[in-house]
Every structure is written in structure tokens, then in C-alpha cells.
Regions:
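Intrinsically disordered, low-complexity non-transmembrane regions of multi-pass membrane transporters
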Residues: 1-33, 43-50, 239-277, 324-328, ...
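Membrane-embedded hairpin module used as a gating/binding unit in multi-pass transport
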Residues: 23-40, 66, 214, 221-325
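C-terminal transmembrane helix pair
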Residues: 27-30, 130-131, 368-489
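Transmembrane helix-loop junctions in multi-pass membrane proteins
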Residues: 32-52, 73-78, 98-112, 137-145, ...
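Structural signature of hydrophobic alpha-helical transmembrane segments
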Residues: 50-65, 114-131, 183-186, 303-315, ...
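Entry/N-cap segments of selected transmembrane alpha helices
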Residues: 115-126, 135-168, 222-223, 278-280, ...
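Alpha-helical membrane segments and immediately flanking helix-loop junctions
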Residues: 173-218, 225, 237, 250-257, ...
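Transmembrane helical segments that form the transport core of multi-pass membrane transport proteins
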Residues: 282-379, 383-387
Length: 489
């Protein structure tokens, strides 16, 4: 495959802008600019209006043009493409800058928010289920069963590695293990914002009696920093896999010496459009059932939440293991997954970027916080890669799914990490990490807050701080003696 270059982008005879020629793409860019920036008439409140209408087709196309502009350029910047993540990462960061610093109108930002993760559009709720169903249905049944028995322990290994490395670096900056666990490890490894940091803040508030926002403000900042590290690590792991092929399964998570690896049903059966349509309908029906189960679970008031995507994963796994879905529909599901993962990723990355506040990252950018967050991410990745082969997983894919997809901002973070790593086919395992792994962290958070966020924690904190101070004095006793002598003189 020929390497992409800038020359082909500006050749009118080529069609390198997402399959569109340069003249057609420039025309589309002008139309989108008019739609977004040119004022027209008045809105319902009497304020200056525009041509923009926040419906699915308009927002899909506008974000596609934005994504193609910076995505195709990013894929051709030599160092950026090779080591940072290419067009996928450039689209994300440029969109984040545009959104944070008001380079697009507020009306457009609201429309993006609705398109991306708000009702009635919520493109993310179409994107992720399509990837989950397409991924899980095309996994060999025996391999799927084997993966479940080993994947949850792999997540636990990652959390352990993250905790140890985080506490080690935290000790250097005078932070106790409890502080690192509650304020760094839990929010970073907790399954994102909505399913992790928000419910954790409520748990913290119930134990301390203080406002939940007090814990959440710092948690969301540190999570934002870790999310950036996770995305960048995804791009670096992609590069590592290319440099060291023995470390990667090229998109396959499980090592299977019996050659019963993940099989692509599309190789065996050429799907028709009706098969893809059937797979899409099946995805919608399964999502409906998952939503019903999620609502019923919430009504039971068990004490911790299970996201509906957890039920979607479990239902799809059951259908695959039970072998009740015809191969032609599985082939259609694979085609559906390919469309979303390969041809709409820049659209979603643009939407994620526009709704990401760069200032959140800047606000928590103290050197100590940055280094602790980095240590947590690298600790999860490093320990997983060390044990992955013994647990029958490919190191690169294991580190991406069980490590980085635990250390990001949930569903959107999974998309960004897998996009940067070019491993979108691993979305089902990424969702296991974010949802089931996140639920496990909520349980851990509830236990930790019960012990260490109450009055008992204050006493423990004082004892540990005293121990830390004594350790520092011991390590620097000679220096202290000299300083004391000088002071006496």
C-alpha cells in the first residue's frame, strides 16, 4: 500500500478527501462554513439566527467535512502520523481547541452536543452498539468463552499495576496511599465520567457530608489528563506493534495455540445489503432489550449501577455462544461494524473534541498531578504487558483494552483510544473494561470511602503523614544537622 502524501491531496484528478475530489471537497467546505458561521434571520428568542439546523443529516455531514479536513492532513504529517496518532488525534485536538476557545458559534456547539450524546439524536448510542454487536458476533464461540474466563482477571492486574505505580510516584510528592487511591486511581480507572466519577462523587459526599462537587472538580480534571495520556499511549502502542510484530495480534486479543482464533465471517460469506440491514435491526432490538434490563436493574436499588451496554454485551455474547444467529447476519454485522469503525470515526472524534474542555486539562496540570496520572496509566499498561502472554493474550491488545480503556473517559474515551491505536474491532472488550471494570471500581470506591473518607480517615491520614515526615527526616538527617547548626550560629 502506497504511503499517503500531501501532493495527492491537492491533485484535482485524485479523490483523496474521503473519496471526494479536491474541487468537490472545497465546495462542501464552503457550504459548511456558510451553514455554521453566516448569520441569517432571528431565532425563537429573537436573537441572531443562522442557517444551521441541528438534525442528524446536517450535523453528520458538517462534522464529516471537518473530520476529513484535519484527518487527511493529520494522516500525512510524518512524525505526527507515526508517533502521535495521525488524523484521528489531530481531529480530536483541533476540535477541542475550536470548542473551548469559542472558534465556532454557541449554537453549533449545542447542536454537536445533541448529535453526539444527547437525545433525540445521540450518535454515540448508534456507534457503540453497532461496534459491540459487530465485534462480538464475529468472534469464534470457543474463543469467546475462553476470553471471558481470563479477561476480568486481566483488568484486575491492570488496576493493581496502576495503584502500585501511582502510590510510588505519589509518595515522592508527599501523598499518602489513601489519597492516591481515592483521588487519582478511582477516578482514572473508574469507567469514565457518567458511570464513574459522578456516582463516585455521590458516594464520597454521602460518607463525608461535604458537597459532591468538591471531590468531582478535582476528579474530572485528573481524569481528563489521564484520558489524554491514554489516547497518546494508544497511538504509541500501535507503533510498538508495527515495530515489534511479536507483541501484537493485529487486532486480535486472544492467543489461541489451537488455531481457533477470532474468525471473520465476512471471509466465508459475502453479505448482501439485506444481511447488513438485518444486522442493524438486530442491533437496535438488542439495544432495546438492554435498555429495559437496565431500567429494571436500576429499579431494584441494589446499590451500584450496571450500564445498559453491559447487558448489550452479555446478550450478544449469549446469542453468539448459543449459535442462534445465522452466519449471513453475522457477516452483515461485520460489514456494519466496518462502516462505523473505519468510515465514521473522524466524525465521532470531531464531536468528542468539540465537547472536550481543554481548560479542564490545564487546570489540573500541576507537575505532581501530571506525573501521578502518567504513572497510573503506565502502571496499568506495563504490568498487563508483562503478564499478558502467560494469560493467553497479545500484549499490545491486552494493554489497550484492559489497561487504557480502563484509564480513559468511558465510551467516548474508548472510541478515542481504539481510534488512535487503530483497534476499533476491540470495542466489545473496551466496553467490558469501561462498564464491568468500572462497576468493579465503584464497589471498590464505596468500600474505600467507607473506611478512609470518614472521620477514621482523618486519624489515619495524620499517622501516615507523620510517618512520611519521619522518613524524609531520616533520609536527610545529615543535611538537617548542617542546617540546624547554621541556624544556631
Amino acid at each position: 500500500m502506497a504511503k499517503k502524501n500531501f501532493k495527492e491531496l491537492f491533485d484535482p484528478k485524485e479523490s483523496k478527501w474521503g473519496g471526494i475530489s479536491l474541487p468537490m471537497f472545497l465546495a462542501a467546505l464552503v457550504v459548511v462554513a456558510i451553514m455554521v458561521y453566516v448569520p441569517f434571520g432571528l431565532d425563537k428568542e429573537g436573537n441572531p439566527g443562522s442557517f444551521l439546523r441541528p438534525n442528524f443529516l446536517i450535523m453528520f455531514s458538517a462534522l464529516a467535512v471537518f473530520g476529513l479536513l484535519f484527518g487527511e492532513i493529520g494522516d500525512r504529517i510524518p512524525i505526527w502520523d507515526e508517533y502521535v496518532g495521525g488524523g484521528t488525534i489531530l481531529v480530536f485536538f483541533v476540535a477541542a481547541v475550536f470548542g473551548t476557545y469559542g472558534l465556532v458559534p454557541e449554537k453549533f456547539m449545542k447542536a454537536v452536543d445533541v448529535f453526539y450524546n444527547k437525545q433525540p439524536v445521540n450518535f454515540l448510542e448508534m456507534f457503540i452498539p453497532a461496534l459491540i454487536v459487530g465485534s462480538v458476533l464475529t468472534v469464534d464461540r470457543k474463543t469467546l468463552i475462553k476470553s471471558i474466563s481470563g479477561y476480568i482477571p486481566l483488568i484486575i492486574v491492570g488496576v493493581f499495576g496502576a495503584s502500585v505505580c501511582g502510590m510510588a510516584v505519589g509518595f515522592i510528592f508527599g501523598k499518602t496511599p489513601q489519597d492516591v487511591m481515592m483521588n487519582y486511581v478511582l477516578p482514572i480507572m473508574g469507567g469514565g465520567t457518567g458511570a464513574g466519577a459522578i456516582p463516585m462523587s455521590e458516594m464520597w459526599s454521602s460518607k463525608t457530608g461535604r458537597p459532591a462537587s468538591e471531590w468531582f472538580a478535582f476528579a474530572i480534571s485528573i481524569l481528563s489528563i489521564a484520558n489524554v495520556f491514554a489516547i497518546l499511549c494508544g497511538a504509541l502502542l500501535k507503533k510498538l506493534g508495527e515495530a515489534k510484530p511479536s507483541l501484537t495480534g493485529n487486532g486480535e486479543l486472544i492467543i489461541d495455540n489451537s488455531k481457533e482464533a477470532i474468525k471473520d465471517k465476512e471471509v466465508e460469506i459475502k453479505p448482501e445489503l439485506t444481511d447488513t440491514t438485518a444486522a442493524f435491526i438486530l442491533t437496535g432490538v438488542l439495544f432495546m432489550v438492554s435498555h429495559i434490563l437496565g431500567e429494571l436493574w436500576e429499579s431494584l436499588n441494589i446499590g451500584f449501577d450496571l450500564h445498559r451496554l453491559v447487558f448489550l454485551i452479555l446478550l450478544t455474547m449469549f446469542l453468539n455462544i448459543a449459535n442462534v444467529v445465522p452466519d449471513r447476519i453475522k457477516a452483515g454485522a461485520k460489514r456494519m461494524q466496518t462502516f462505523f469503525s473505519k468510515h465514521t470515526i473522524w466524525i465521532l472524534m470531531a464531536a468528542v473534541g468539540f465537547t472536550t474542555d481543554v481548560k479542564e486539562i490545564i487546570n489540573a496540570a500541576a507537575p505532581s498531578n501530571i506525573l501521578i496520572a502518567l504513572a497510573i496509566v503506565l502502571g496499568a499498561v506495563g504490568l498487563i504487558m508483562l503478564v499478558a502472554r502467560k494469560m493467553k493474550f497479545h500484549p499490545v491488545e491486552a494493554a489497550i483494552t484492559a489497561g487504557l480503556c480502563m484509564a480513559n473517559r468511558g465510551g467516548a474515551g474508548d472510541v478515542a483510544v481504539l481510534g488512535a491505536a487503530d483497534r476499533m474491532e476491540l470495542m466489545s472488550f473496551a466496553q467490558i473494561s469501561s462498564r464491568i471494570g468500572g462497576a468493579m471500581m465503584l464497589v471498590l470506591g464505596s468500600v474505600m470511602f467507607s473506611f478512609f473518607a470518614s472521620e477514621k480517615y482523618i486519624i489515619t491520614e495524620l499517622i501516615l503523614q507523620l510517618g512520611y515526615s519521619l522518613a524524609v527526616i531520616h533520609l536527610n538527617r545529615k543535611k538537617l544537622k548542617i542546617e540546624w547548626r547554621n541556624y544556631g550560629e
